[in-house]
Amino acid sequence: EISGNYDTVSVSMPVLMNKDLPLTVSLVGGAGATEDNCVVEVEPKSIQVAGDTTVLQKLNQLVVATVDLSSFATSYEATVTIPLGNDLKNLSGVTEATVRISVRGLETAKVTATNITTTGTNRRVEIMTTSLDVTVRAPADTISQITADNVRVVVDLTNYRATSGTVAVPAKVYVDGFSNAGAIGEYVVNVHFTGG
């Protein structure tokens, strides 16, 4: 037998709200491109979610992806999973979004870079890659001015202290003299470690 004498009972229940959240993309500028010269489309444009009022009041959008603009030349398309925290419920039933990005007003050109240097080591090394074909992106009035003299390839060997033999090492490409230009893609340089 259970008995009690209560004047008041306190029950705490979370208040849930529904909200349409636009889906967006975070852009990392690079190779002459910024969010100002990109057209971004996300499909669907938004989803409806439910969640605790205190959580949803702080959310105005959902970032579905972060895209490095130096990773592609003129267009990008990917299907991504819509990220939702455990405290939110997707009422739309759509779990993936398609992201399309177009770069406008910029042109690309191939430049053969021969200025290849290393940094981050005092070991004896030999750069086996003597030239590297680099794709450069910039506004039309700038692209024609860029030559091999402006393109510099730097290989950071800081993490290769105990390495021996020939190794393909990621390289960074710089376009000197043009702040609105840069290299597209990833590059590697073959480096031979000759001694200690």
What are these regions (language model features)?
Residues 1-196:
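Structured interface patches
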